[in-house]
Curated annotation (Swiss-Prot):
The gene is Taok3. This is Serine/threonine-protein kinase TAO3. Residues 24-277 form the Protein kinase domain. Pfam families: Pkinase (PF00069). The keyword Nucleus does not apply. Signal peptide: none annotated. Residues 405-416 have a biased composition (Basic and acidic residues). One of its GO terms (molecular function) is protein serine kinase activity. GO terms for cellular component: cytoplasm; lipid droplet; plasma membrane raft. The keyword Lyase does not apply. The modification N6-acetyllysine is found at residue 830. The lineage of its organism: Eukaryota, Metazoa, Chordata, Craniata, Vertebrata.
Length: 898
């Protein structure tokens, strides 16, 4: 997707559809930085005064710039607090985002720039109080500013403190990005990629540094290279207030903010209860400070205006300056400029390493505007001196201090000439709208100039920031990749465990079904065997009964025949009596046989019942044996499955352990590679910085050497002038002496006296000339020696400074390397402990599961045996009640089918 195409509805809703160039008019540049430029503007529809921050998202790092714009817009939309800048909207125009906010007079840093001295303690407390209220609001919503400094703490006309510039802000806490401005960075931000995450406490550190900045006009380590300052902050003690004039309350507040350990650093809400913030102060302290600053800015701009008007007046009246006048004027302006730069020391020129978008497009050069506008006033002054003076006084007739031409519409202008067009521009200058500010015109001009001059340093810092950001992305990408790999590995192992559990469950179900089928089959076989056994006994008993009945019939016949024979032999017994005796005998025999048959049937029934009962008992015992065999088979199967599961878990643990060690090694290797690359880049940056400083010093020395002949010539001319003055004095003295001698000596001696005086004058002039030559030679030698010594001293001081910075870098890198190695060792130990603990838990789990399985085995077998024993006892008791004795020793009959 092309950046700015706004195809995503959610992104499109972030921007207004109006044309910003038509909506906002009278744009005047009021600030410049790495992101681009900030303009004063007026809403053409509502006449509301606003500030417009233009951010280009074209060129290099387009995607990053666009994402940063989206992040800042989303961040600003969330803010609703009196101590944060009010967001008005955002517009897009030709790959440039117009971020519109409420207009503020300037920043706390501008106060230092204008007054050229630290703020008073009550003023610092008032500014800090407002900033803390804004930070408390941000931190409550888990937001981090990450670029707190005096330049980002703005002031409004009523004296309201506003936090601004959220280009570095984070919408998540904790965070771990390397962002901010070097001198104000907290140690944990510098070490973010190496040691982990940070939270809103980084803003508290930056606020403490800002307090020192307001109290000493610049932050600690400001005279140091920005990169070296990072190394210094990361490994040295926290800075403190240097001067003893500050109160103990202020000192404690700063020390409280600058605790090295983030956990010991207070939160914003805690600092709001600090006595430094809560103590009484004048209610209008900030309003009075703003008014004094506006008055001072008015005077500065008036002074600059008068200087430019004087220069242009001289050029118009006298033409170009001659060489000597030009050199003198250049020297004066150069010394003034050097004094101004040395005294002010622009803090805004420090490039912020926050994610920001750079816009190289800006308005016309403000100095050119001042020159053009001054020339216009000059034309009017030539026409009417009184009008010119009046115009000069009305340039700053209100609190509106300085003026900028409309941004983006400046064209190269011709040399100032008293023409009609110049007069019209002068009229435009007089009638153009002014606006209130606490930032002088020269400060804005210097910011633009320094922004252009320090492009190399800014690019170096930006490149370093991009490298750290890229390294962080690489680490996050690798961590995500390793996490995905570990998740996939664990999912695979989990599936394997689930598959094993499912297979085990299926096997147990199959075994249970098999055992049920076996039991049912055995029951059917037992029922068939019992039926067959009963039928066999009944058949045998039927056969025995038949045999017994046949035997009785035979015996009955024999007895009958025997009785008949006995009766036939007995002839004495009457026939009737014989018949009766035979009948009675038959009846007795039949009765006996009937009793014997009944007894046999009873015995057979008892035998049948007893043997059937015994057979049932045998079937029951056999069923018990089958149940015991089944439960042992099931328990053995479970044990085998559990052992296989445990072996699989051990294998999984070992494979996970190998993967964890391999991933840790991969992550640590990448981290060390990135640190080596970072250290190499830092070293290259430092060497490049050293070379640049040496080149600048060499260039300065070359310029001094080139300038030395002019300086020597001027000094030689001064000595020559002294010599000429001395010669004139001696000539006058010679004339006076000659006249006196001629008056007091006879006329005939005049010739000799004149010759003597002439020789004496010649001798003295020769001595004077020799002294002159000697003075010139000594002066040249001393100046050359002095220049050589000064340059050598500067070279020595620079070498010492660069050596100290290099040693600081080496110490920082050694510390980072040692900390990283210690971190790696801790990670390895932590992993070893985790692996060891996990293995111990696994072994304990295996032991517990085996013990539980053994307990289950014992309990189930015990339960089964007890149940079977109760069942056997119940069966035997019932057998006893049925009249059967001990069935255990009962033998089957020989004809038993078994």
């Amino acid at each position: 997707m092309r950046k700015g195409a706004l195809k995503d509805p959610e992104i499109a809703d972030l921007f207004f559809k109006d044309d910003p160039e038509e909506l906002f008019i009278d744009l005047h540049e009021i600030g410049h930085g790495s992101f681009g430029a900030v303009y004063f503007a007026t809403n053409a529809h509502t006449n509301e005064v606003v500030a417009v921050k233009k951010m280009s998202y074209s060129g290099k790092q387009t995607h990053e710039k666009w994402q940063d714009i989206l992040k800042e817009v989303k961040f600003l939309q969330q803010l609703k607090h009196p101590n944060t800048i009010e967001y008005k909207g955002c517009y897009l125009k030709e790959h440039t985002a117009w971020l519109v906010m409420e207009y503020c007079l300037g920043s706390a840093s501008d106060l230092l720039e204008v007054h050229k001295k630290p703020l008073q303690e009550v003023e610092i407390a008032a500014i800090t109080h407002g900033a803390l209220q804004g930070l408390a609001y941000l931190h409550f919503h888990s937001l981090i500013h990450r670029d707190i400094k005096a330049g980002n703490i703005l002031l409004t006309e009523p004296g309201q403190v506003k936090l601004a510039d959220f280009g570095s802000a984070s919408m998540a806490s904790p965070a771990n990005s390397f962002v901010g401005t070097p001198y104000w960075m907290a140690p944990e931000v510098i070490l973010a990629m190496d040691e982990g995450q940070y939270d809103g406490k980084v803003d508290i550190w930056s606020l403490g540094i800002t307090c020192i900045e307001l109290a000493e006009r610049k932050p600690p380590l400001f005279n140091m290279n920005a990169m070296s300052a990072l190394y210094h902050i990361a490994q040295n003690d926290s800075p403190t207030l240097q001067s003893r004039e500050w109160t103990d309350s202020f000192r404690r507040f700063v020390d409280y903010c600058l605790h090295k350990i983030p956990q010991e650093r207070p939160a914003a809400v805690e600092l709001l209860r600090h006595d430094f913030i809560r103590r009484e102060r004048p209610p209008k302290v900030l309003i009075d400070l703003i008014q004094r600053t506006k008055d001072a800015v008015r005077e500065l701009d008036n002074l600059q205006y008068r200087k430019m008007k004087k220069i242009l007046f001289q050029e118009t009246r006298n033409g170009p300056l001659n060489e000597s006048q030009e050199e003198e004027e250049d020297g004066e302006q150069g010394s003034n400029l050097n004094r101004e730069v040395d005294s002010l020391g622009s803090i805004h020129s420090i490039p912020s390493t926050s994610v920001s978008t750079g816009s190289r497009s800006s308005s016309v050069n403000s100095m050119q505007e001042v020159m053009d506008e001054s020339s216009s006033e000059l034309v009017m002054m030539q026409e009417d001196e009184g009008t010119a003076n009046s115009s000069a006084s009305t340039v700053h007739k209100k609190d509106h201090v300085f003026v900028r031409d409309e941004a983006g519409h400046g064209d190269p202008r011709p040399e100032p000439r008293p023409t009609q067009s110049v007069q019209s521009r002068a009229l435009h200058y007089r009638n153009r709208e002014r606006f209130a500010t606490i930032k002088s015109a020269s400060l804005v001009t210097r910011q633009i100039h320094e922004h252009e001059q320090e492009n190399e340093l800014r690019e170096q810092m930006s490149g370093y920031k991009r490298m750290r950001r890229q390294h962080q992305k690489q680490l996050i990408a690798l961590e995500n990749k390793l996490k995905a790999e570990m998740d996939e590995h664990r999912l695979k192992l989990q599936k394997e465990v689930e598959t094993h559990a499912n297979n085990s469950s299926i096997e147990l179900e199959k075994l249970a079904k098999k055992q049920v089928a076996t039991i049912e089959k055995e029951a059917k076989v037992a029922a068939a065997d019992e039926k067959k056994f009963q039928q066999q006994i009944l058949a045998q008993q039927k056969k025995d009964l038949t045999t017994f009945l046949e035997s009785q019939k035979k015996q009955y016949k024999i007895c009958k025949e025997k009785i008949k024979e006995e009766m036939n032999e007995d002839h004495s017994t009457p026939k009737k009596e014989k018949q009766e005796r035979i009948s009675k005998h038959k009846e007795n025999l039949q009765h006996t046989q009937a009793e014997e048959e009944a007894h046999l049937l009873t015995q057979q029934r008892l035998y049948y019942d007893r043997n059937c009962r015994f057979f049932k008992r045998k079937i029951m015992i056999k069923r018990h044996e089958v149940e015991q065999q089944n439960i042992r088979e099931e328990l053995n199967k479970k044990r085998t499955q559990k052992e296989m599961e445990h072996a699989m878990l051990i294998r999984h643990d070992e494979s996970t352990r190998e993967l964890e060690y391999r991933q840790l090694h991969t992550l640590q290797k990448l981290r060390m590679d990135l640190i080596r690359l970072q250290h190499q880049t830092e070293l290259e940056n430092q060497l490049e910085y050293n070379k640049r400083r040496e080149r600048e010093l060499h260039r300065k020395h070359v310029m001094e050497l080139r300038q030395q002949p002019k300086n020597l010539k001027a000094m030689e001319m001064q000595i020559k002038k002294q010599f000429q003055d001395t010669c004139k004095v001696q000539t006058k003295q010679y004339k006076a002496l000659k006249n006196h001698q001629l008056e007091v000596t006879p006329k005939n001696e005049h010739k000799a006296i004149l010759k003597t005086l002439k020789d004496e004058q010649t001798r003295k002039l020769a001595i004077l000339a020799e002294q002159y030559e000697q003075s010139i030679n000594e002066m040249m030698a001393s100046q050359a020696l002095r220049l050589d010594e000064a340059q050598e001293a500067e070279c020595q001081a620079l070498r010492l400074q660069l050596q100290q910075e290099m040693e600081l870098l080496n110490a920082y890198q050694s510390k980072i390397k040692m900390q990283t190695e210690a971190q790696h060792e801790r990670e390895l130990q932590k992993l070893e402990q985790r692996v060891s603990l996990r293995r111990a838990h696994l072994e304990q789990k295996i032991e517990e599961e085996l013990a539980a399985l053994q307990k289950e085995r014992s309990e189930r077998i015990k339960t089964l045996l007890e149940r079977q024993e109760r069942e056997t006892e119940t069966f035997d008791m019932e057998s006893l009640r049925m009249g059967f004795g001990n069935l255990v020793t009962l033998d089957f009959p020989k004809e038993d089918y078994r």
